[in-house]
A protein has these predicted regions:
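Generic N-terminal amphipathic, Lys/Arg-enriched alpha-helix
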Residues: 1-13
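Glycine- and acidic-residue-enriched helix-capping/strand-helix junction motifs
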Residues: 14-22
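Small-residue-rich beta-alpha loop regions that form the catalytic core of phosphotransfer
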Residues: 16, 42-43, 48-93
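Short, basic/aromatic recognition patches that contact phosphate-bearing ligands
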Residues: 16, 29-30
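Short amphipathic alpha-helical segments and helix-helix/interface helices
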Residues: 21-25, 76
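Anion (oxyanion) recognition and catalysis
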Residues: 25, 29, 80
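Short internal beta-strands
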Residues: 33-40
């Protein structure tokens, strides 16, 4: 089964996260995957926003998290009953 929609959530204070966000978005879009970007990171990366983390949890099939361990754990804690598979990309120490 192919994933058609992913959510993208990131720690906005990590160095280089805006550039990494744009690169991740391009990679998924080239593969015809819709990317739902959380409002705050979308603004930082100059990308189209999809909504709050809660909205992204509801709509996405997979959540991609850009950040450290704390960011990933925070996403899991806030997903509630809408928890989806999470793919973490560690961008810090």
């Amino acid at each position: 089964m192919r994933t058609k929609t992913i959510g993208l959530i990131a720690h906005t204070e990590k160095a280089g996260v805006a550039e990494l966000t744009r690169a991740v978005v391009r990679e998924f879009e080239q593969r015809s995957v819709e990317v739902l970007i959380e409002n705050e990171i979308a603004e930082l990366a100059d990308e189209k926003a999809a909504g709050s983390p809660e909205e992204i949890f509801r709509r996405a099939e997979l959540i991609v998290v850009l950040g450290g361990d704390g960011t990933i754990l925070n996403v899991v804690a806030h997903a509630g009953e809408n928890l989806k598979p999470i793919f973490g990309i560690n961008v810090g120490f």
